[in-house]
C-alpha cells in the first residue's frame, strides 16, 4: 500500500477518535496500570495523554501532499494491528483505547517514523528516550522480548548502541 493512501485512511480514523474516546481510554489505561508504582503510572499517563492527542492533531492537520509517497508492506501493518489488539485487558474502555492507539501508533511507525513514546516518558530507573544526530535511543528497546510488545516496530535503537 502506498504511504499517502495509508495516511489518508489514518487521517479518516483520527476523526473517529472523540473527546469521549480519550476519556474512556484514560480510564481504561488507569485501570490496566493499577498495580504499577504510583509515581511511574502518573508520569506515564501524563505523557501518554499529552503525546497521543498531539499526534492525533498532527495527523488531522497534515495533508497527503506533504508526505513522501512510498510503499508500505501490508503484512507489516497487519502484524502491528494484531499486536496492538492483543495487548492489555479486555475491560470497559478497550474499544476507545484501541481506536486511539491504532491510529497514532501506525502513523508513528509507518508514516512519521518517530518513537512510539513521548521523549519525556520516564521508564523504570528514571531513564528516557534520547535523540542524538537524528537517531533515537530507547532504554527498554532490547528489554522488551515479549511477543506482544510492539518495540520491534519502533524506530528507536537500543540505548546501549549510543
Curated annotation (Swiss-Prot):
It holds the Pfam family DUF2115. Belongs to the UPF0305 family. This is UPF0305 protein MmarC5_0909. It comes from Methanococcus maripaludis (strain C5 / ATCC BAA-1333).
